[in-house]
């Protein structure tokens, strides 16, 4: 059995993490489980994240509110060193390229890129171009690439049909990827995103789990959150959406009548897992999403990807390869960690976001920190840091 570590066992680690902006735990939102030092996907050794944020008011009156987020499973070696991976669509009104080959091969080759719906193509092409420039030279003449690029729609706040994401932004996101703290909220691919009718965006979290055989494993999650209606919103089990009903999106369009947004969830772990096991992990991300009050509506694109950085040697070309993996009866800790980290990553995205004036007069308010604390106290769920 793999067991989740208790939060008290690692308080010294996450106390050292950089936190320029308050995160959900800083506001007193209670979560189960112990985080890594950064409480981020980059707590998984080797994983790096790079982001480019595009915010500009154009002379035409249009507003650019978009960007690119890059997740590199093996850091600078990612372009030439695959990992085991799997994906799952809870509701498929969205796009994640490269998934047919992930299903077929069980491998994720290259970075995971997040952007807006109408920039998927340019980001995909730019990743291939970057691999041609920076990867190992092709001596066979038969090299090919099927990059993984996922999207959510930021057209409420961003001039999405202005096609403002360009190849150089992809190169910048890949180049600036680091293993340090991950910026959250109005950044990268999440710059113009909205969830539960609050300003939202990028969020991340992690969990440490203990294996019976000794040592620890880490599960890290990063989300690009752009889904959900206000009333069903729950945070730490509290029906927050029913008490924070003001400050909804100002829009010149008719209000949404159902859940039509999307969320991309990326789960990373250093636990040795095979592709079919990672498929099970990817599915568990949906349970963390459900904790927030999502019901994966017909118009929502809820697409999840999981990968393991273990078994690097088995990725090398060989007639026969060997890989280690966590036993079937020992996966529950990884499942639980995935659910917990997904929930916290989404709340972190909401807490980090700031009010945003967007395209065509649209305006999205961020969740009120004071209002959230007030509702948590009302239900006895306020847990200030000690």
Regions found by a protein language model. Name each.
Residues 1-4:
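Positively charged n-region of N-terminal signal peptides that target proteins for export
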Residues 20-386:
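Alpha/propeptide regions of enzymes that mature by internal proteolysis
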Residues 6-15:
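Bacterial N-terminal signal peptides
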